[in-house]
Amino acid sequence: MTKYIFVTGGVVSSIGKGIVAASLGRLLKNRGLKVTIQKFDPYINIDPGTMSPYQHGEVYVTDDGAETDLDLGHYERFIDINLNKYSNVTTGKIYSEVLRKERKGEYLGATVQVIPHITDALKDKIKRAATTTDSDVVITEVGGTVGDIESLPFLEALRQMKADVGSDNVMYIHTTLLPYLKAAGEMKTKPTQHSVKELRGLGIQPNMLVIRTEEPAGQGIKNKLAQFCDVAPEAVIESLDVEHIYQVPLNMQAQGMDQIVCDHLKLNAPAADMTEWSAMVDKVLNLKKTTKIALVGKYVELHDAYLSVVEALKHSGLANDTAIDIDWVNANDLTAENVASRLADADGIIVPGGFGQRGTEGKIQAIRYARENDVPMLGVCLGMQLTCIEFARHVLHLDGANSAELDPETQYPIIDIMRDQIDIEDMGGTLRLGLYPCKLKPGSKAAAAYGNQEVVQRRHRHRYEFNTKFREQFEAEGFVFSGVSPDNRLMEVVELPDKKFFVAAQYHPEYHSRPNHAEELYSAFVTAAVENAK
């Protein structure tokens, strides 16, 4: 029988529910259990695919092409699993599906209501997360905080799950803030008590509290919360601020969190062996060397817009025994006049993805600087497309070369829309999304990075492609297409072999990076940056 764990939040948002859920997932996986995890987002958007990165941070793409919340990146990196489209559910997605069924007459003329139709659809997503992965445990995080109007159908669905599958198969974990008032010199439990009261008013009694705090709470505070919130004292778990998020699973294990969960759910599983994870964390905290990477982006004010890129760089730093110092460079501010001085201190330059015109000329200046000064450079998605445009302008001398996305009237559309996308007007869900194979060119830097594999599979999120009409011109000047689709129609990876490392990929390598296994192309880039720093 599959077990279901529901993680809710109270008092404030952004309290770290996702890290708590991911940490628990890692602990249960290391006990030998098969775990999957999902995020419920109560907003009305179908998915975050068309949301501004300033609103929501990065869009995380799964193998099957779902555009999802950035928390899924945490889940995959912590637990080292690949999730699917059932791992991110929004209000908009649920209502869209229910309304589509209503229009088709699938409800046989019934009055369609929040209960049972919306709640049943939500429960179906929870159960499908289990059946599509054959998991022992499903962990579901609900976004927002208890008391939000938009969360009510989600919490009702969670309440009903207990009756549907039995109390021994369901566990509710509530994450709250335990504020510390410096003036009074004490921690305040009332916000947590009121949050639990609100949750109980909706029919959910939490089985465990996870309290986010800056200072150790002490047993007295835990006993007080246990008494007034009706949970066992040992089931009040501290989530202290830490130097690195990968410390959290170890802190949770030290407090017996995973054992309490297993006892409640009657899971007979051996203790989690966290030796490898602990060694990784110890290494992260004791790196002596630092490598400076300039990240040239258009959303650099919000670092979460590049969360997976940053994590992949850190993982690659770990693989190369170096800490990564990210220099956040706003592409909008880069010009031909200031690019050399702005990037002079960089050991390596990364140009990540993005959409739209803003900042593209600055990114092109950064790419040109990297090429002309032989600074290791990695381009990703739009970064790959702009790498091609920069080469066309300054090496092939195709003045005005551009992407048809950025300049529909360009004489040289180096990047053009995919043929099957020409008549599509909707923006959402119309990209090339998900896992696709890439055939690597033997002897190339890309092939070397991937251990000379013939084919790798990586996730994509883009609409435009390199225009193969220009391929021969590029190759005549030493530009190598080192990764292509198996049918040779789509250009996936490009590089200049005479440079230390000048490689760009149309796909998003960062989605495959894990703390205990850095993504290979990122790792090769950081290796080159480390060498460049010497």
Swiss-Prot record:
EC annotation from Swiss-Prot or TrEMBL: 6.3.4.2
Enzymatic reactions: UTP + L-glutamine + ATP + H2O = CTP + L-glutamate + ADP + phosphate + 2 H(+); L-glutamine + H2O = L-glutamate + NH4(+); UTP + NH4(+) + ATP = CTP + ADP + phosphate + 2 H(+)
InterPro entries reported in the protein's UniProt record: Class_I_gatase-like, CTP_synthase, CTP_synthase_N, GATASE, GATase1_CTP_Synthase, P-loop_NTPase
CC per GO annotation: cytosol
Binding-site residues for CTP, renumbered to this chain: S13, D148, I149, E150, K188, T189, K190, P191, T192, Q193, K224
Biological process, per Gene Ontology: 'de novo' CTP biosynthetic process; pyrimidine nucleobase biosynthetic process
S-S bonds: none
UniProt entry tagged with the keyword Iron: no
Binding residues for L-glutamine: Y54, G354, L382, G383, M384, Q385, E405, R463
Catalytic residues in the record: C381 (nucleophile), H508, E510
Residues binding Mg(2+), per UniProt: D71, E141
Pfam family, one: CTP_synth_N
Protein origin, superkingdom: Bacteria
Activity control mechanisms: Allosterically activated by GTP, when glutamine is the substrate; GTP has no effect on the reaction when ammonia is the substrate. The allosteric effector GTP functions by stabilizing the protein conformation that binds the tetrahedral intermediate(s) formed during glutamine hydrolysis. Inhibited by the product CTP, via allosteric rather than competitive inhibition.
Binding site for UTP: S13, K188, T189, K190, P191, T192, Q193, K224
Note: CTPSs have evolved a hybrid strategy for distinguishing between UTP and CTP. The overlapping regions of the product feedback inhibitory and substrate sites recognize a common feature in both compounds, the triphosphate moiety. To differentiate isosteric substrate and product pyrimidine rings, an additional pocket far from the expected kinase/ligase catalytic site, specifically recognizes the cytosine and ribose portions of the product inhibitor.
Xref: HAMAP family: PyrG
Quaternary structure note: Homotetramer.
Entry similarity comment: Belongs to the CTP synthase family.
Protein name in UniProt: CTP synthase
Upper classification of the organism: Bacteria, Bacillati, Bacillota, Bacilli, Lactobacillales
